[in-house]
């Protein structure tokens, strides 16, 4: 009986891949990414004494810019547009340390190592409230879950019940069928985004400093990405069990490596670059910039452009796979009539 079970397990390659791949993935994630203490804080030093003060900063402050002609207002703008994570204002008075509170662990690490004689000030999240930072990220997580898991299960269920094959023989274009199948999940995920956003603003008192138009643009592009994940998974799965397995393998890296839980700055370089390839990473960057900082359009445009590129690639691939699934399969019965065989005496 035991040998029979092992043979059955060996036939299910996706289960074997999940059993072997998931522990290895978790080991890598928690070994190289699960760190809350940030050791390098990208810093700008501004003011007349910028060069002198920069030389005296603790090693944790990675000085990326020294500008003696800039002032505190310029430093605040740099933080608002996510150009740096901390600014030291050295204008002759005791230095002032400005820290980006939207990056919770960066701010906490900076406050534990305040330069001697400096006065710290936390911007965008003065109380270092966890909910203020997490709610914008949770919007992306909920959209990711609904768009990936629920969509993939819904489409696979149609295939298991045979209704997807019925749609394939109806006088509808594959694109019409795809839009009809995806639209309900799009609307559900959009509704969830609105509900979570409203709850964050009303219940958790999360500030909203940016543009509602930019919020809508980020939300729509991210929806196309996650729905593309869901549809692509459904085309690669023969059952709901396989769809759940693939969805888990899609969700886990995005949750762990996007900066939602563990700060990107604390990750090893290779793992951090994996995080940069994940759409949730850029959605979170945009949401924190819109909600907490009121970042300028020019600062939010690069993450938005990356999301747009991902939406085109992922959703385009998903539609291509879905159209292939709907294409009529030629069977032996569909073959043309046999050529007559000449019988000779």
Residue spans for each PLM region:
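Extracytoplasmic/periplasmic domains immediately adjacent to an N-terminal transmembrane anchor
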Residues: 1-133, 324-345
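Transmembrane helix boundary and interhelical loop/hinge segments in multi-pass membrane proteins
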Residues: 9, 148-170
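Transmembrane helix segments
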Residues: 28-40, 238-281
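Short helix-capping/hinge motifs at transmembrane helix termini and TM-loop junctions
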Residues: 33-37, 152, 156-157, 200-208, ...
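Membrane-interfacial helix-loop-helix junctions in multi-pass membrane proteins
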Residues: 73, 124-128, 207, 259-314, ...
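Long, hydrophobic alpha-helical segments
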Residues: 134-153
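Transmembrane helix-loop junction
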Residues: 153, 157, 170, 201, ...
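Alpha-helical transmembrane segments and their short interhelical loops
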Residues: 174, 178-248, 252, 297-304, ...
């Amino acid at each position: 009986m035991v040998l029979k079970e092992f043979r059955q397990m060996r036939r299910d390659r996706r289960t074997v891949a999940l059993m072997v791949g998931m522990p290895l993935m978790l080991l890598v994630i928690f070994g190289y990414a699960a760190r809350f203490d940030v050791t390098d804080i990208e810093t700008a030093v501004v003011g007349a004494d910028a060069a002198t003060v920069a030389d005296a900063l603790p090693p944790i402050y990675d000085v990326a810019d020294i500008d003696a002609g800039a002032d505190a207002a310029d430093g605040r703008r740099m933080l608002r547009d996510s150009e740096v994570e901390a600014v030291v204002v050295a204008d002759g008075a005791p230095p002032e340390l400005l820290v980006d509170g939207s990056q919770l662990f960066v701010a906490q690490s900076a406050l534990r190592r305040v330069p001697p004689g400096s006065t710290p000030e936390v911007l965008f999240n003065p109380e270092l409230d966890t909910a203020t930072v997490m709610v914008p990220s949770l919007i992306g997580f909920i959209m990711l879950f609904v768009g990936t898991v629920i969509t993939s299960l819904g489409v696979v269920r149609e295939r298991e019940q045979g209704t997807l094959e019925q749609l394939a023989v109806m006088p509808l274009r594959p694109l019409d069928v795809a839009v009809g199948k995806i639209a309900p999940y799009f609307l559900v995920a959009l509704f969830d985004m609105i509900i979570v956003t409203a709850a964050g603003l009303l219940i958790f008192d999360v500030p909203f400093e940016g543009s509602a138009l930019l919020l809508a643009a980020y939300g729509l592009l991210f929806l196309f990405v996650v729905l593309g994940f869901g549809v692509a998974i459904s085309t690669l799965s023969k059952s709901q069990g396989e769809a759940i397995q693939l969805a888990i393998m899609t969700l886990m890296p995005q949750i762990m490596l996007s900066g939602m839980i563990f700060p990107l700055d604390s990750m090893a370089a290779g793992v951090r670059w994996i995080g940069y390839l994940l759409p949730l990473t850029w959605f979170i960057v945009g949401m924190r910039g819109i909600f907490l900082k009121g970042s300028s359009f020019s600062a939010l445009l690069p993450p938005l452009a990356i999301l747009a590129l991902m939406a085109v690639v992922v959703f385009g691939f998903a539609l291509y796979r879905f159209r292939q699934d709907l294409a009529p399969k030629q069977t032996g019965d569909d073959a043309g009539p046999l050529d007559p065989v000449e019988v000779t005496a």
